[in-house]
Amino acid sequence: GAVGASGSYEKDVTLAMAREVKRQLETTGRYKVVMTRDDDVFVRLRDRIAKARAAEAELFVSIHADAMRNRETRGASIYTLSETASDDEAAALAARENRADIIAGVDLSHENKTVMNILIDLAQRETMNHSASFAHILVEELGREVQLVPLKPHRFAGFAVLKAPDVPSVLVELGYISNKADEQLLTRPHYRTKVAASLVRSIERYFVKHPPG
């Protein structure tokens, strides 16, 4: 992971934030939270997706705090999967030898390749729409509490962790620890609590709009 302007580590900042989000969500009594990691270990990107799908997750949130060469760059941003990346991933999924249980627990092994491509594509498009809906809520809620990147805080990219075909997924860049101001904020417990609360409010709003199941 990235190293901050004053020596903090992204892996520590993001794990602390994830634990605080988990604590606040579980305090409501309405959520089961599964962490992709809960200590100082590296989990491969594909394994993170697999863990979310194995847990039958209704929502996947990947938390980051990256570094940039331009140390003036700061602010939070939200990423969801791009349309192009979606189509490429759908093709790759369809090509897998083991075709069973690939979409929301539905066995597609009896379907021909063309039908399976269509089913995977439809499932992923619906997932992308839900992801974009959550991203919109996140921009609103985070924007009330933190500085967002200018112009386009909701961005699109082909991050591997966003490619689960049946789990709405977002990647949250909390800020850039290469920027001293962002780094100082991200290492403060009070700020962490505030940001986690905005993430929890976003999740609550999302599930009101898109009830589980």
Specify the residue positions occupied by each region the protein language model found.
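Catalytic-core regions of hydrolytic enzymes
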Residues: G1-K113, R125-H136
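Active-site-adjacent mobile loop/cap segments within catalytic or ligand-binding domains
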Residues: R69, L119-G213
